A protein has these predicted regions:
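Sec-dependent N-terminal signal peptides
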Residues: 7-17
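Non-catalytic cap/lid and distal C-terminal segments of serine-dependent acyl enzymes
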Residues: 22-193
Length: 193
């Protein structure tokens, strides 16, 4: 192989490694779910260089297929100074149809139910504390979902003190009574989202 080709090849390899070096995977053993759950973690490009900086966190449902598009959009927004750098946590939910079990609701009550209630608690009681202990996080949390998970994230608005400051709902399939409950609950929240 000519010398120039070796240099080009090495450059491509190094660029590829740096592009993917900030994306890692982890498994969290959940007592609430009674299983391990895989997550993808995306750290901002400046994370290692700025050891005193804290970052907002985006918790992403359907992280196994939404992680890369959201990561790309966040980097693009940051490049143009429209979005701050952020940590992205993608929650995997599509291995064995978990996304439907994770978002189980009682159709009569319109509330999370069975595994849906357990998954709701997993995020608030296990995942968020785990991430906040392991990484430098700012007190600004965002949650995003698509379809059934987009509807599910709105249940966090039902809490007296919502866990998240921002919600990104892509094509939500709203649970029964949700279109009435959300405006009522938002009116009760004293601290701006």
């Amino acid at each position: 192989m000519p010398k120039i080709m070796k240099k080009v090849y090495l450059l491509i390899v190094l660029i590829s490694l740096s592009a993917f070096s900030q994306k890692t995977f982890d498994n969290i053993k959940s007592e609430k779910l009674g299983e391990e759950r895989r997550i993808t973690i995306g750290l901002p490009d400046s994370y290692e260089a700025n050891p005193n900086k804290k970052y907002p966190v985006l918790y992403l449902m359907d992280g196994d297929y939404l992680f890369d598009p959201f990561s790309g959009a966040a980097k693009y927004g940051n490049y143009w100074d429209d979005l701050p750098e952020m940590i992205i946590i993608g929650i995997h939910q599509n291995k064995d149809g978990e996304r439907y079990e994770d978002t189980t609701i009682d159709q009569n009550a319109g509330l999370q139910f069975e595994k849906g209630a357990e998954f709701f608690e997993f995020i608030g009681a296990e995942l968020i504390p785990y991430i906040e202990k392991k990484y430098r996080t700012a007190p600004f949390r965002i949650i995003a979902g698509h379809d059934t998970t987009a509807s599910f994230i709105n249940f966090y608005l039902y809490k007296e003190q919502p866990l998240f400051k921002a919600y990104i709902c892509l094509s939500p399939e709203l649970a029964p009574k949700m279109e009435v409950r959300i405006p009522e609950q938002i009116a009760k929240i004293k601290e701006p989202l």
